[in-house]
Amino acid sequence: MSIKIENLNHIYMPKTPFEKIALNNINCEIEDGEFVALIGHTGSGKSTFIQHLNGLLSPTSGNIIVDGVNIADKKVKLSDIRKKVGLVFQYPEYQLFEETIEKDIEYGPRNLGISEEEISKRVKKSMEMVGLDYETYKDKSPFDLSGGQKRRVAIAGVIAMEPKVLILDEPTAGLDPKGREDILAQIRLLHKEYGMTIIMVSHSMEDVAKIADRVIVMNSGEIVLDGKIAEVFKEVETLEKIGLAVPQVTYLIRELRNKGFNISEEIFTISQAKEALLEIIRNNN
């Protein structure tokens, strides 16, 4: 299932003294099964953009074609689109409200009018998909969990709707290092094992380098760069001009290259750097 964006514009409070252009002529296509990271500094238009993808915001102009349907058309039933495109907001654990984890996750599917058997099946499957054992956690209060576990419950609640596309707005924000790694591992699993299309908003270049296939960089409501990790992260000067940076390890690799080390410039994670440096040591010995 693809999402195609054509000449998308969004203006907040148009024709008033407070008019603000949030999105300016956005064009891109997200293919079925892709893992796309969306990066940009605060105010670049990332959150506004993703809220158009399942109809939470309507465009001022332009087209958003989801699975062949232009959701900018006012005749389109947006509830059908939201079953296909799930959106997990930043700090989604603040939206947990039920007595037990099972009840919280089943809230969305229960509103679809499906059978009790199907609801139960979806809850169990979604908990498994985010790494929470059903029997262990189903009767626990979501408020007794760690921050990372709460976030997994919130993500499971969206997954239980069985979307084809999952959009995550800063999924690791506010988590400690372990919680951060756990969430990234589960997102990676959703993509690789379950074939889900993932669109992830992030400020962390390190997170993006670890798990995304493609990066879209936004600035002032426009797409500045769009390509594979290696293509985008080579544009160091362009990224720095708009207040961003490549992963710290990449700066280290650039310095080593400048000092004459024969090492690939396409190194963006610590594990990649470790392997490359070990290879240099082995060759020198």
From Swiss-Prot:
It comes from the Bacteria. Forms a stable energy-coupling factor (ECF) transporter complex composed of 2 membrane-embedded substrate-binding proteins (S component), 2 ATP-binding proteins (A component) and 2 transmembrane proteins (T component). It is found in: Cell membrane. Its EC number is 7.-.-.-. It is an enzyme of class 7 (translocase). InterPro entries: AAA+_ATPase, ABC_transporter-like_ATP-bd, ABC_transporter-like_CS, ABC_transpr_CbiO/EcfA_su, ECF_ABC_transporter_ATP-bd, EcfA2, P-loop_NTPase. ATP-binding (A) component of a common energy-coupling factor (ECF) ABC-transporter complex. Unlike classic ABC transporters this ECF transporter provides the energy necessary to transport a number of different substrates. This is Energy-coupling factor transporter ATP-binding protein EcfA2. SMART domains: AAA. It is a peripheral membrane protein. The lineage of its organism: Bacteria, Bacillati, Bacillota, Clostridia, Eubacteriales. ATP binds at residues 40-47. Pfam families: ABC_tran. Keywords: ATP-binding, Cell membrane, Membrane, Nucleotide-binding, Translocase, Transport.
